[in-house]
């Protein structure tokens, strides 16, 4: 556990794991059997982690969703899909590497995969624009969606972005049109679409690849119209109220499932997806398999009717007499 990055609220877990690592080093360097103490502390660490993650606050979930070791789109592609062949460029201007996509196989069935991609180090983060997609990324995604529709290939999207790139260059290249067109086109694509929020689901930047037939969120991911920090800056004129904003935004998977805004929650390993990315991928794959089975038998007309009904269900309200 030496290379694990612990969040602020995981301090007690980090201290326990540090003791375990120290005992293991001592055991290796001496003939003393410390296995009993190591096992005791390991069980205590696992229990503490489980208890802590069972009662995370919305703000703590935001921190987990942003964890630097959390699996990204290409990690899930490597674990879940085979024969992935990445496709580049929007055929109009450029190739935005904050969105990746291409052809792959899911259980030997051809499909199209599209998702946001962040970086692990400074160089990668700059190359991926820190996970903020530009208009070219959304146009590249739409090109792949249209390719999938042409050959009736199922589409899997993976959402993990703080939001669309807010730079002047993005506005000059018509960011709002790119997002709006994706929303419109995805609503009428005649092929199954399964969307999964794997980390941050930030506003229109997430929605632009988030319209589908089945919406999934990982247990400790978030989905919101605005980041807690930005919300705090607007409402309280101070970014230091991010925790209160997170509580008010209703951005967690369980809250959004209760509101009917997503369909399924994919549970994460104890301690979050970053603790065991491969196990997380196996758990998610089962949810994706079940989700695809539920929609792949529908013909194009049935698929569109069902999708339209889902979209029209969003935002319903009821008037009550005062």
Curated annotation (Swiss-Prot):
Pathway(s) this gene product operates in, as recorded in its UniProt entry: Lipid metabolism; malonyl-CoA biosynthesis; malonyl-CoA from acetyl-CoA: step 1/1
UniProt keyword Acetylation, yes or no: no
Disrupted-gene phenotype: Becomes sensitive to thailandamide antibiotic.
Subcellular localization: Cytoplasm
Keywords: Antibiotic resistance, ATP-binding, Cytoplasm, Fatty acid biosynthesis, Fatty acid metabolism, Ligase, Lipid biosynthesis, Lipid metabolism, Nucleotide-binding, Transferase
Note: Thailandamide is a polyketide that is toxic to human cell lines but also has antibacterial activity on E.coli, S.typhimurium and S.aureus. It probably acts on acetyl-CoA carboxylase in the fatty acid synthesis pathway, which is rarely found to be an antibiotic target. These data suggest it might be a good starting point for engineering of novel antibiotics.
Protein name: Acetyl-coenzyme A carboxylase carboxyl transferase subunit alpha 2
Organism ancestry: Bacteria, Pseudomonadati, Pseudomonadota, Betaproteobacteria, Burkholderiales
